[in-house]
């Protein structure tokens, strides 16, 4: 509602202005005084993501193995966008359920790998132009533990056929969507309003079932360090970063975006300030919604024992966090020195 929109924009507009307090430093030698304005710490603020990203990525180093990793992207047909946007908490969660069930169940099938694997799922809801484009990025460990607790992988080849992933993911997501509709758990606002009618909703299901859902699997990462760099790039990303904003006037904003209809070349787009804010706010996640989730060997209940066992089987050294127990000031100093 308008209250949420106002509060979200007000918070970010006040970041590092003094509205959230200040820290004052005084030099013991010369008495020079420095004033540092506090940040808003909002997870959608472009100025506040670097610090939590560095701490999170550094902690993830303890979970990384010297083993193959793959990047799989799960997308849904654009026809579902209106109903997903009207039911973000339920239907974003359904994306995680469908993606995780697909990966875990197929990996456990002896026809493919026959193991318990580990992976991280990250929700992004935007395209390059800040359009609404919900999709899941999954960083998938390319091996796992079989029923005898032995390590098994498929080398540098991804162990699951893309067509099988596609059909399985489509079936699981559509089944949960249908169940939510039948249980009267969905809301129908704006362009989703027609789907409150059973026959219109049924037509939507038929259209989406008839489409090929094309998950995307990238080449394997080149070692554990490249996985870490990739996690840093994707995990705490927001709809648009400051460097992409090229110009602003009293009424317009110009920003750069990739043109995927023209070989992914960058182009500049100018839209009204109101439209820019509208697009940005589409990607504010529901309150307390967890965007980064861990599964299988990497889940909280498993990783302490099972990842240690995997590390021993593979002969991997355990990375010790460089930032654990450091203060915010020490963390900032460390990351700046490393850069």
What are the roles of these predicted feature ranges?
Residues 1-6, 11, 336:
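Single conserved hydrophobic/aromatic residue that forms the stacking wall/gate
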Residues 7-8, 12-25:
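N-terminal alpha-helical interaction blocks
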Residues 22-24, 42, 333-334:
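Residues immediately within or flanking Cys/His clusters that coordinate Zn2+
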Residues 25, 29-31, 134:
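Polyanion/phosphate-binding surface patch
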Residues 28-29, 46-50:
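Short, cysteine/histidine-rich loop/knuckle motifs that typically chelate Zn2+
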Residues 32-35, 53:
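Short functional micro-motifs and their immediate structural scaffolds
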Residues 37-40, 55-58:
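Short Cys/His-rich "knuckle" micro-motifs
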Residues 57-136, 140-338:
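Catalytic residues for metal-mediated phosphoryl-transfer on nucleic acids/nucleotides
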């Amino acid at each position: 509602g308008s209250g949420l929109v106002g509060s979200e924009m007000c918070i970010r507009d006040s970041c590092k202005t003094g509205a959230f307090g200040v820290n004052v430093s005084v030099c013991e030698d010369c008495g020079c005084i420095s004033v540092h304005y506090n940040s808003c710490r909002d997870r959608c603020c472009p100025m506040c993501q670097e610090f939590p990203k560095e701490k999170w990525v550094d902690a993830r180093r303890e979970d990384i193995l010297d083993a193959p990793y793959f990047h799989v992207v799960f997308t849904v047909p654009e026809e579902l966008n209106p109903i997903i946007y009207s039911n973000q908490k339920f239907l974003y969660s359904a994306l995680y359920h469908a993606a995780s069930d697909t990966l875990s169940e197929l990996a456990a099938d002896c026809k493919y790998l026959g193991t318990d694997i580990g992976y991280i799922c990250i929700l992004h809801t935007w395209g390059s132009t800040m359009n609404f484009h919900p999709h899941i990025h999954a960083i998938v460990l390319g091996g796992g533990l079989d029923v005898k607790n032995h390590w098994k992988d498929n080398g540098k080849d991804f162990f699951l056929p893309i067509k099988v992933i596609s059909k399985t993911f489509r079936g699981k997501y559509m089944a949960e969507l249908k169940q939510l509709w039948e249980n009267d758990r969905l809301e129908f606002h704006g362009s989703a309003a027609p789907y409150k009618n059973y026959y219109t909703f049924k037509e939507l299901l038929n259209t989406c079932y008839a489409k090929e859902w094309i998950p995307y699997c990238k080449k394997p990462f080149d070692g554990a360090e490249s996985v870490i760099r990739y996690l840093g790039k994707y995990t705490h990303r927001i709809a648009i970063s400051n460097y992409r904003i090229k110009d602003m006037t009293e009424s317009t904003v110009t920003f750069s975006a990739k043109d995927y209809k023209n070989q992914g070349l960058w182009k500049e787009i100018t839209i009204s300030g109101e439209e820019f804010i509208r697009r940005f706010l589409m990607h504010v996640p529901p309150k307390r919604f967890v965007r980064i989730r861990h599964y299988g060997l990497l889940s909280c209940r498993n990783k302490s024992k099972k990842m240690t066992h995997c590390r021993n089987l593979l002969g991997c050294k355990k990375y010790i966090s460089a930032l654990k127990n450091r203060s915010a000031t020490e963390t900032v100093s460390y990351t700046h020195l490393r850069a």
